[in-house]
Design a protein with these regions (language model features):
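Intrinsically disordered, low-complexity proline/glycine-rich segments
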Residues: 1-163
Length: 163
């Protein structure tokens, strides 16, 4: 991924509510809203209202659909991310201090994302290689990283409560 031509986005949580904005400068690219005690969520990207559903108990899948039409736009199954009609990629850790990202069939990452979680807010950044639509992939990356941060916080709380 070329740093000069890639699109750099910010993941912002403007309030304590579980709502995030993905911005490129002042332009709003996508929005994400996640419930605290349930999986799934809602969002908007590229002018479409989206719904994120989680399916399965042992092998969890996350499915992104158009809220109005029910059309499936993307599916995350394990580490495999399938963007319908666009491409498939693998969601993986890119190494220490590099965050996580979507890696194409050639082994090159075309999306890189990192989040920081504080006591009340989670923020971060997403970088997408030139030539890729930033809206839906950045929303999926933000969703996966925020859920991962939630799971880590819950595990830490359980460890503290057990001692």
């Amino acid at each position: 991924m070329d740093d000069e031509t890639s699109v750099k986005l910010l993941l912002l949580q403007p309030t304590r509510r579980r709502e995030w904005e993905i911005r490129e400068g002042e332009e709003l690219v996508a929005e994400l809203s996640l419930p605290a005690m349930r999986s799934g969520g809602r969002g908007s990207a590229a002018g479409r209202e989206l719904e994120i559903r989680t399916q399965g108990m042992l092998r969890r899948e996350h499915v992104v659909t158009d809220a109005a039409t029910g059309e499936e736009l993307a599916r995350v199954r394990g580490h495999a991310v399938e963007l319908r009609g666009i491409e498939s990629a693998e969601w993986k850790s890119l190494g220490r201090d590099q965050g996580s990202g979507l890696v194409g069939p050639g082994g090159e990452p075309w999306l890189r994302a990192k989040v920081k979680s504080g006591a009340f807010r989670t923020t971060g950044q997403v970088e997408i290689a030139a030539g890729h639509d930033p809206a839906l992939p950045s929303l999926i990356a933000a969703y996966l990283l925020i859920r991962k941060a939630d799971e880590a916080a819950a595990a830490a709380s359980a460890t503290v409560a057990a001692t």
